[in-house]
Amino acid sequence: MINAFALEDARLVRIDENTNAELNSAIWLDLIEPSSEEREILQEGLGQSLATFLELEDIEASARFFEDEDGLHLHSFFYCEDEEDYADLASVAFTVRDGRLFTLRDRELPAFRLYRMRSRSQRLIECNAYEVLLDLFETKIEQLADVIETVYSDLEKLSRVILDGTQGEAFDQALSTLTEQEDTSSKVRLCLMDTQRALSFLVRKTRLPANQLEQAREILRDIESLQPHNESLFQRVNFLMQAAMGFISIEQNRIIKIFSVVSVIFLPPTLVASNYGMNFDIMPELGFKFGYPMALGLMALAAFAPYWYFKRKGWL
């Protein structure tokens, strides 16, 4: 799908028809999983070849940030959620050429959707492709800041459950959610680092107007301010995970202690019972009228004596 936008009164206006004449007036062409026919339209009408989705998966810096005859290329990660609401990353290709911005992605993304909504009423200042690119990155960082705030709030709720130490269904669910928050934080960190590298490359390779250069530097400062907050999330997750493992270990030790006490208590009575289970011809107690009650009493005493001794020593 091709979403083309042209400038009208310093605002982005969507182009309804994807003809060559209409596309030539576009300043931003946003492509979501384009078909081979749509790729051919761009190739024939604008002379622009697009990256493949396999190329978007390359993580080497030389393959993600470069400049060639097809323009300036940036491949950047954007935070999103998959169909099961788990944290995910989508790689987006940005290409700036002949005053146009081309974006290529394989799915709809919250940052793009939010920027399109804002662009209906928001005027561009410099009215060029780099401003649209920087605005998208700015929206991306705002989204990441919101994600960090959400994780902070979720960890606050999880800490109450985990630090309470009461194990059960809520405790197990908290552990599962904790691992999800760790995964979310790691993806946010990757997005921040990736955006930092992309903007640094953009500032080095282009001569941006003063306003846009300041905007790029402001985004970089925002990234630097968010990174410590995100790192503190990792520390909080690690603390809660260690606390949870500690409570689990204590509970396991308590259960093992119970089994140990039971085995110690019942071992002496078992010894008494095994003595009277021996098959000897001469066992005086067998002929004694009160032999059986005496054996039961001896077994009870053998069970109580070690329990009393261990209790007095403070071992239980």
Curated annotation (Swiss-Prot):
SUPFAM superfamilies: CorA soluble domain-like, Magnesium transport protein CorA, transmembrane region. The record marks N253 as: Essential for ion permeation. GO terms for cellular component: plasma membrane. A motif (Probable selectivity filter) lies at residues 277-279. Its main location: membrane. The keyword Signal does not apply. It is a multi-pass membrane protein. The keyword Membrane applies. The chain crosses the membrane at residues 258-278, 290-310. CDD domains: EcCorA-like_1. It is found in: Cell inner membrane. GO terms for molecular function: cobalt ion transmembrane transporter activity; magnesium ion transmembrane transporter activity; nickel cation transmembrane transporter activity. InterPro entries: CorA_cytoplasmic_dom, CorA_MIT, CorA_TM1_TM2, Mg/Co-transport_prot_CorA, MgTranspt_CorA/ZnTranspt_ZntB. Keywords: Cell inner membrane, Cell membrane, Ion transport, Magnesium, Membrane, Transmembrane, Transmembrane helix, Transport. It comes from the Bacteria. It catalyses: Mg(2+)(in) = Mg(2+)(out). Homopentamer. In the absence of Mg(2+), interactions between subunits are weakened, and dimers, trimers and tetramers can be observed in vitro. The central ion permeation pathway is formed by the first transmembrane domain from each of the five subunits. Mg(2+) binding strengthens interactions between subunits and leads to the formation of a symmetrical homopentamer surrounding a closed ion permeation pathway. Low Mg(2+) concentrations trigger both a conformation change within each subunit and a loosening of the interactions between subunits. This results in an open ion conduction pathway. In addition, this results in a less symmetrical shape of the whole complex. Mediates influx of magnesium ions. Alternates between open and closed states. Activated by low cytoplasmic Mg(2+) levels. Inactive when cytoplasmic Mg(2+) levels are high. Belongs to the CorA metal ion transporter (MIT) (TC 1.A.35) family. This is Magnesium transport protein CorA. It comes from Pasteurella multocida (strain Pm70).
